[in-house]
Structure formats: structure tokens, C-alpha cells
């Protein structure tokens, strides 16, 4: 399946189609959207965002705890879309504050 992902970035909103077997960060790069990242392995907070609408599968990640995931935090480098959704990006400072 392919889902519509909307990213709310500091420079505006961007929408793209993301297959359910491609990480959101990787697909964003494919379509020319620059997002922050560092480890690309779900073990840091550089790519952190917040899910506003929809759902993701980020079971490959290890940095976030269950409480943070429950609050909507997402690591875009290890997140697959499982529905159409909206994610606020560039949230590392807020997450680690």
C-alpha cells in the first residue's frame, strides 16, 4: 500500500506518497525534501517529529520510549506509514528539552 504523508516543516507543508515498506525519511529524500537526520538507525533524536494525524510503524527504532511514542513522537528514519498522515518535523529541540 502507499499512503499520503504530509510534512509540516519550518519552511512550509509538503505532501508526498510513501509506500508502506519505505521509511518516511528515505521517501522524503527521494522526492527532494530535506529533513534532519544523523544516525539513520532509530537510535538518536536528530530526525524526531510528531505525528499529528495518522499512524506509523517505528518498531525498528530504539531511542524513543513507549511514553514518548504514545505522545506522538516519531523518528522519521525508522518510521513506515500505516495510514495517511501528518507529521511535524524538525522537533529534536522540543523532544530533548
Swiss-Prot record:
Start and end residues of each 2Fe-2S ferredoxin-type domain: 3-93
GO molecular function terms noted in the UniProt entry: 2 iron, 2 sulfur cluster binding; electron transfer activity; metal ion binding
Entry keyword set: 2Fe-2S, Chloroplast, Electron transport, Iron, Iron-sulfur, Metal-binding, Plastid, Transport
Highest taxon of source: Eukaryota
InterPro entries: 2Fe-2S_ferredoxin-like_sf, 2Fe-2S_ferredoxin-type, 2Fe2S_fd_BS, Beta-grasp_dom_sf, Fd_pln
Chain residues that bind [2Fe-2S] cluster: 39, 44, 47, 77
Compartment annotation: Plastid, Chloroplast
Cofactor note: Binds 1 [2Fe-2S] cluster.
Keyword Metal-binding: yes
Pfam assignment, any one: Fer2
Assigned GO CC terms: chloroplast stroma
Cofactor requirements of the protein: [2Fe-2S] cluster
GO terms under biological process: electron transport chain
Cited function: Ferredoxins are iron-sulfur proteins that transfer electrons in a wide variety of metabolic reactions.
Family: Belongs to the 2Fe2S plant-type ferredoxin family.
Protein name: Ferredoxin
Organism: Colocasia esculenta
Taxonomic placement: Eukaryota, Viridiplantae, Streptophyta, Embryophyta, Tracheophyta
Amino acid at each position: 500500500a502507499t499512503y499520503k504523508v504530509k510534512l509540516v516543516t519550518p519552511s512550509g507543508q509538503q505532501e508526498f506518497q510513501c509506500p508502506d515498506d519505505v521509511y518516511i525519511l528515505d521517501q522524503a529524500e527521494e522526492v527532494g525534501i530535506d529533513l534532519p537526520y544523523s544516525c539513520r538507525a532509530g537510535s538518536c533524536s536528530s530526525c524526531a517529529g510528531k505525528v499529528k494525524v495518522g499512524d506509523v510503524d517505528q518498531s525498528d527504532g530504539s531511542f524513543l520510549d513507549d511514553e514518548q511514542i504514545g505522545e506522538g513522537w516519531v523518528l522519521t528514519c525508522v518510521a513506515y506509514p500505516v495510514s495517511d498522515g501528518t507529521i511535524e518535523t524538525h522537533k529534536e529541540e522540543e523532544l530533548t528539552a
